[in-house]
């Protein structure tokens, strides 16, 4: 089974991102806009209960926080992904680190750069054009975050929520 761990932003932020993703992201229909805390990983069905228990522990050790989303960035030249930048708060960093230590040992493919993908799989020319236009626009959103989600991938490639974890002591 393939799992991933994400934060979903508010509907307003998702709507803004989806307005762009419809045109620039071939994964638009597979998963809603999100901030990845742990990239997708394979696991056995019998490990799911232990994973859920560990995520409850991590959530209880993390205080709710404010998510700041703004500006447009890119991972070029590594890859042609365009994204909304997400401010790296201590809480986001803690969540990401906890999901790559101890129970969740897994090699990182990239350093943690919190972001909300709005375009990917673009040609070099299209990437440069879209990025140039979006960088001229003013984007800034903030919202309180009090939960994260464990997702699993269905056979058709779409992702769905398995469980939601509320941040802070006494919420799980």
Curated annotation (Swiss-Prot):
Stored Gene3D superfamilies: Cyclic phosphodiesterase (3.90.1140.10)
InterPro entries, per the entry: 2H_phosphoesterase_YjcG-like, Cyclic_Pdiesterase, YjcG
Organism superkingdom: Bacteria
GO molecular function, one term: hydrolase activity, acting on ester bonds
Entry keywords, A to Z: Hydrolase
Active site positions: 34 (proton donor), 115 (proton acceptor)
Pfam families found in the cross-reference section: 2_5_RNA_ligase2 (PF13563)
Segments forming a coiled coil: none
Motif (HXTX 1): 34-37
Protein EC: 3.1.-.-
The keyword Hydrolase is assigned to this record: yes
HXTX 2 (motif): residue ranges: 115-118
Protein family: Belongs to the 2H phosphoesterase superfamily. YjcG family.
Name the record gives this protein: Putative phosphoesterase BCAH820_1309
Species of the source: Bacillus cereus (strain AH820)
């Amino acid at each position: 089974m393939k799992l991933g761990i994400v934060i979903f932003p508010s509907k307003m932020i998702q709507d803004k991102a989806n307005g762009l993703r419809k045109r620039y992201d071939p994964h638009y229909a597979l998963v809603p806009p999100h901030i990845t805390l742990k990239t997708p990983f394979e696991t056995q069905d019998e490990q799911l209960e232990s994973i859920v228990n560990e995520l409850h522990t991590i959530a209880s050790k993390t205080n709710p926080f404010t998510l700041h989303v703004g500006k447009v960035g890119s991972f070029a030249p590594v890859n042609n992904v365009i994204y909304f930048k997400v401010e790296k708060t201590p809480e986001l960093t803690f969540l990401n680190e906890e999901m790559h230590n101890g129970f969740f040992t897994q090699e990182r493919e990239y350093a943690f750069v919190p972001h909300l993908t709005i375009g990917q799989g673009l040609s070099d020319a299209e990437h440069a054009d879209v990025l140039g236009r979006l960088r001229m626009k003013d984007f800034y959103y903030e919202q309180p975050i009090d939960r994260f989600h464990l997702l699993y991938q269905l056979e058709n490639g779409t992702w769905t929520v398995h469980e939601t974890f509320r941040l802070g002591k006494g919420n799980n």
